Structure formats: C-alpha cells, structure tokens
Amino acid sequence: MDAALLHSLLEANCSLALAEELLLDGWGPPLDPEGPYSYCNTTLDQIGTCWPRSAAGALVERPCPEYFNGVKYNTTRNAYRECLENGTWASKINYSQCEPILDDKQRKYDLHYRIALVVNYLGHCVSVAALVAAFLLFLALRSIRCLRNVIHWNLITTFILRNVMWFLLQLVDHEVHESNEVWCRCITTIFNYFVVTNFFWMFVEGCYLHTAIVMTYSTERLRKCLFLFIGWCIPFPIIVAWAIGKLYYENEQCWFGKEPGDLVDYIYQGPIILVLLINFVFLFNIVRILMTKLRASTTSETIQYRKAVKATLVLLPLLGITYMLFFVNPGEDDLSQIMFIYFNSFLQSFQGFFVSVFYCFFNGEVRSAVRKRWHRWQDHHSLRVPMARAMSIPTSPTRISFHSIKQTAAV
C-alpha cells in the first residue's frame, strides 16, 4: 500500500469526537469550521500519535503511545501539543511525561546504567583534579620545559578540555537534545574536536619517541611548532568536514544521537583509528630498538627514554582499547554486556587520571624539580625565621645591636 495513502487512512481514524471532548473539558473555544484558521486539522506525528482536529490556541493532550521502538510505555500518562493561533500544529511535542514500563531485565540494566553513570561522574571528577594538578606543575616548573615535557603538557591540556566539555554535554536535557539547538550542536562539535586533538597528541608522543630512538635524530633539532601544528591544527579541518556532513545529512539530536560507528562519524573516527595504528607501529619499532641496542646502556638520557616508552606502552593500548571498544559487540549474554558497561565506563572516565600519573606524577624530572623547589623553600624559610627573631630581640649591655654596629662603622 502506498505510504501516503496509508497515512491518510490512519489520519481518517483520528476521531473528531476526541477534539470535542477536549473542548468540553475546557481546553479551548468552540470549533468554528467556517472561520479562517480557526482550528488545526487532524494529523499523525512521527511516533504515530493521533492529534485530532482542535481549536486554535488549545493545548491538546493525548495518551502516551503504548509501544515505541519495541518498548512498552505507560498509557495513563499524557503527551501535549499546542494548536497555534494560525491553525497549525506546533512542531514541538512534549513527550516528557511518557515513561517506559520496564520488565525485570530492563530494570536490572537500568540499575547498572545508573551505577555506570555514577562511575563516569566520579572518574571524570578525579581525572579533572589530577589533570589540573599536573597542568599547574608543568606551568610552575620552568626548569623542566624541554620538548618532551611540553608534549606531555599539551596532551594533559587536551584531556582537561575534553573532560570539561564532557561535563557540559551532561547538562543537555532531553528537550534540548530533541530540538537540536544550535548551541548544543556547537558543544558537541567542540567536544569532538578535543577528542581528536587527544589522539593526535598521543600520535605526537609516539612520533617524538620514534624520531629520537629509532631514527636517532637529535631531539634538539626537532621543531616545537611542527608538533603544535600536528596536535592542534590538523584536527580542525577534520572536525569542520564532520560538522558539514552532520549539517547536511544528519542534522538532528544535537549531532550525538546516532549509534557509534555511523558513516558520517567516520570522518573524524577514521583519522583517529589511523593515528592509533601508526602509533602501534612506532611502539613496535621503539621496543625492538630498545631490546637490541639500548639494553646495556645506563646513561641518564637512555633511562629517561626507557621510562617514557614504558609510560607510552601502558597508555597507548589503554587509550586505544577504550576507543575501539565502541566498535566491539560485547555479546548477547547479560554478563558480557554488564561487564562491557562497567569496563568501558571506568576506562573512559579515569584515562585522564592515568595520563597525569604516568606523564607527570611518575615523571622523574618533575619529581626532582618539585623536591628542589621544596628544599629551596624550606631553606629560604629557615633562614628568615632566625633573622626575624634576631631583629626582634631588644638591645642589652651584653649584646651588640645592629644599630650600634652602624654607629661604630660611621665613627
């Protein structure tokens, strides 16, 4: 049957009596079919709810749909839609009161999702605190601002910005999400930009180590501006292309309502997967060189490289696995899906904390610089206290004051 004909038949089944019942309940003025734009015509929305002919200016209520997307809903609650003064239906329909009726399995999953959300919030809060502390340490310790630590600093910065944007995304409510507001789409775009910069700075980490160890190229000759361009500038046109694709092909739900792995999303997910694969190649070569050539070496530079490689070996698979999990089917059984929910939530939310620990708090240069700064502060403080006490002691016949010394020197 033709879709338009089927839709017309369904609309015909929307009874005019329902609209008259609304009027009897006091929802609007009497219908005047002869008057211009005095009522809204009977129509069906995209969900399939029947909206009967209603008077202009009336707020019409209809029972929530019994089923939608295979989920059963509570039909004792109502959805609302306004018939505008010009005789047209408002495009926005209020389904906020409609709640699904959950069976035991759905209730169990709902509970696990709520717990996973708490884990997400906790992990992001811990990560932001650790990342900000690491950022301030790199900012304060100017003595360790070599190229390697500048790269760490930028990676930490991307995680801070990404986590902040994640919190902003959580503020988007269902109505804003469905109405596809411009500011909501901007938040999604900025969030995805920082996601891409995240992985490109991980690529810069791998590129730096590969250049220094495998290619035996002097790190002093590497240009910081080149790495800054790779980490911050290259992701920009990628996200612009993704935003254009979303605008023309999937301009709905604030641009993050689709399932992971959607075709338009591969515009930015593809480069991320590519740099992850390149980083794995880099690390394979780095480990091979360390195993063959640097095993017997004990120089301080080599030790630093080894520590950096260990950190990257831990972090890169960790970050790569958390991202690639979105493309993995956890399985049909309940245990696999529940484990997937918790495992993914934990790694996604705490990865900023792991970055701070491996690249800052466990960084030997950072710890040494902090100890030196602390000892310097202690020495400075311990010198000031005795001097202040000496200045506060009154002069006596048995002691020579600072004032008397000046007078003696003058004579």
Swiss-Prot record:
Residues 1-19 form the signal peptide. It is found in: Cell membrane. It holds the Pfam family HRM. Keywords: Cell membrane, Disulfide bond, G-protein coupled receptor, Glycoprotein, Membrane, Receptor, Signal, Transducer, Transmembrane, Transmembrane helix. The keyword Lipid metabolism does not apply. Residues 140-146, 215-221, 292-302, 365-411 are cytoplasmic. Glycans are attached at N13, N41, N74, N86, N94. GO terms for cellular component: axon terminus; dendrite; plasma membrane. InterPro entries: GPCR_2, GPCR_2-like_7TM, GPCR_2_CRF2_rcpt, GPCR_2_CRF_rcpt, GPCR_2_extracell_dom_sf, GPCR_2_extracellular_dom, GPCR_2_secretin-like, GPCR_2_secretin-like_CS. GO terms for molecular function: corticotrophin-releasing factor receptor activity; corticotropin-releasing hormone receptor activity; G protein-coupled peptide receptor activity; peptide hormone binding. Its main location: membrane. Residues 1-108, 172-185, 250-265, 328-334 are extracellular. GO terms for biological process: adenylate cyclase-modulating G protein-coupled receptor signaling pathway; cell surface receptor signaling pathway; long-term synaptic potentiation. The chain crosses the membrane at residues 109-139, 147-171, 186-214, 222-249, 266-291, 303-327, 335-364. It is a multi-pass membrane protein. Disulfide bonds join C14-C50, C40-C83, C64-C98, C184-C254. The transmembrane domain is composed of seven transmembrane helices that are arranged in V-shape. Transmembrane helix 7 assumes a sharply kinked structure. Belongs to the G-protein coupled receptor 2 family. Monomer. Interacts (via N-terminal extracellular domain) with CRF, UCN, UCN2 and UCN3. Has highest affinity for UCN, and considerably lower affinity for CRF, UNC2 and UCN3. This is Corticotropin-releasing factor receptor 2. It comes from Homo sapiens (Human). The lineage of its organism: Eukaryota, Metazoa, Chordata, Craniata, Vertebrata.
